[in-house]
Regions:
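Short, low-complexity N-terminal intrinsically disordered segments enriched in polar/charged residues
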Residues: 1-30, 125-129
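A short, polar/proline- and glycine-enriched secondary-structure boundary/capping micro-motif
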Residues: 45, 93-96, 122-128
């Protein structure tokens, strides 16, 4: 592996957890595509680094800074990575706790594409509605 993609993912999750969007931006390809599933106001395909960072900002804004993605495990090879995470957040009187699988395509040491797969999309949709 020319670039240690496992460390790229680890650094990305640490930057996200600490709110370090500048560092996180360094780990995203300029032409990244981020696929957020579901039927809620945050669902959709986000194209470009600025769009993805704006999405991340909304996650924190909508939850009063309580949004977390706690990593259970990370796996990576030369081209792909997987993050097994538990997502937790609060929004008013609503709480969210759900397990997600984040599948990454990495290119030149940066995240080029990500697909989020929820184990309970209906619960996530209700939370973000």
């Amino acid at each position: 592996m020319a670039v240690d993609n496992l460390n790229v993912l680890r650094d990305g999750y640490q930057a996200f957890a600490s709110g370090n969007m500048a560092r996180l931006g360094e780990l995203l390809a300029d032409d990244i595509v981020w696929h957020t599933p579901g039927d809620n106001p945050l669902s959709g395909d986000y194209r470009g680094k600025d769009a993805v960072l704006t999405l991340f900002g909304r996650l924190f804004e909508e939850t009063g800074g309580t949004f977390r993605a706690d990593v259970h495990d990370l796996l990576a090879n030369d081209d792909h990575g997987i993050g097994l995470v538990t997502v937790t957040a609060r929004r008013g009187d609503r709480t969210l706790t759900v397990n997600d699988v984040n599948v990454f395509h990495l290119r030149d040491g940066k995240v080029a594409e990500c697909w989020i797969a929820s184990t309970d999309q209906q619960t996530e949709d209700k939370f973000w509605a």
